[in-house]
Amino acid sequence: KDEVYNWKNTKYAIFRNTWDYFEKFEEFNNWIIKTKTKTKFINCIELVKWNTDKKYLKFLSDKGINVSKTEFINKKSSISLSDLFKKTQFDQAIIKPCISGAAKDTYRLNKSNFHRFEKTFNSLLKKNDMIFQEFLSNITIFGEISLIFIGKQFTHAVKKIAKKGDFRVQDDHGGTVEVYNPVKEEIEFAKLCVSKCPSQPIYARVDLIY
């Protein structure tokens, strides 16, 4: 953040290190609105804003992309975790805000222990739209694959692995990263995901979990 910098001096701006945008989302959104008339964002501003809210998963699902089974809960809803487990029949689940990152306020729970998280869930729900998502246990065994595209071209991939005893693959939580060589089917699926975005990104990352 630099209030002094004149963005009219910049022809293009790439979103590179906005790791905490979700903690200051209103401020971030206001900056976007103010700055979009002074420079050109890469990716386009409409796509950036679309991608900040994990409701994009429903958009992709409606386009035929296979995504993790997910329930979206509106802020200030009275629904409980008990209700959600009954509705979905998930054995394990993840809860997190729709606008979030780096696994902040992300919790893993199951049918036996969800009662311990009701208070936390209700507290988060007062301020956020929330996700209730089926937990895919393979992430603790195999990890999460990220495929990177520049334009429409696949460039490289990595595998993110959670530390032992955790499910969060981010390095903030002890996760590690290694080079990954995806098979053709993984690349093609990731390309399909990118093609379904509301507009075509100049750069993109697609995360895969088995």
Where do the model's predicted regions map?
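Conserved metal-phosphate-binding beta-hairpin within the catalytic cores
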Residues: 198-210
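Conserved N-proximal alpha/beta basic substrate-recognition cap immediately N-terminal to
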Residues: 1-75
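Short acidic/polar capping segments at secondary-structure boundaries
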Residues: 46-48, 73-78, 98-102, 112-114, ...
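Rossmann-like NAD(P)H-binding beta-loop-alpha module
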Residues: 64-93
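Short amphipathic alpha-helix with an adjacent loop that forms part of the alpha/beta core around
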Residues: 3-9, 80-88, 121
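Structural motif
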Residues: 14-16, 94, 131
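Phosphate-binding site of ATP-dependent enzymes
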Residues: 104-194, 198
